[in-house]
Amino acid sequence: YDIAREGYTYLLPPNQKHSAAPGDDRGMAAARREFLSKGYYELLLNTLCCQILSRSGDSPVILDAGCGEGYYTAGIYRALTAAGKPPRMAGTDISKAILRSAARRESGIEWAVASSYHLPVADGMADILLDCFSPLALEEFRRVLKPGGYFLYVVPGADHLWELKQILYD
């Protein structure tokens, strides 16, 4: 496969695109990157790192499905590498624009434009599968997760972004 000069591989077949440019656009990617860089979700990132460090072997294979601009993916990659457990790590997202941003964040990760419902990976390849705030594709996740592997799923709670909702809807 050809790797784009930005550092990602495009693996989304035309029949899996439901719009001309699926997923987040360049402006959304920049806004999310700026927001996350302010540390608002650092506690979540640190918690994920602790969970993964406690469950991973020496060189785990980790897939972040719906990785967005790579905030969690890159943070976990760096934490594992610093702990002497360098992972083989991949992040997928349906948005080409957002993966351009992700690839700039960390070059040691394999980034691919792909659907979480049709992941372009072999059966049973992942020791750990991560899904943070992305669509849940359970059948596909079961397919790619190794027997005995770990699935970490992050979903927003009822009060997620409550302060913002109050401003918008009052």
Give, region by region, the residue ranges found by the protein language model.
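A short acidic, Gly/Pro-enriched loop at the edge of an enzyme's catalytic core
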Residues: 117-129
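Class I SAM-dependent methyltransferase SAM/SAH-binding core
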Residues: 61-63, 69-118
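N-terminal auxiliary segments of SAM/dcSAM-dependent transferases
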Residues: 1-21
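Conserved class I S-adenosyl-L-methionine
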Residues: 150-170
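Class I SAM-dependent methyltransferase Rossmann-like catalytic core
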Residues: 18, 23-47, 51
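A short glycine-rich, Lys/Arg-flanked "PGG" loop and its adjoining helix->strand segment in the class I
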Residues: 138-150
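A short SAM/SAH-binding and catalytic strip from SAM-dependent methyltransferases
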Residues: 126-140, 155
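Short helix-loop-beta connector
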Residues: 54-61
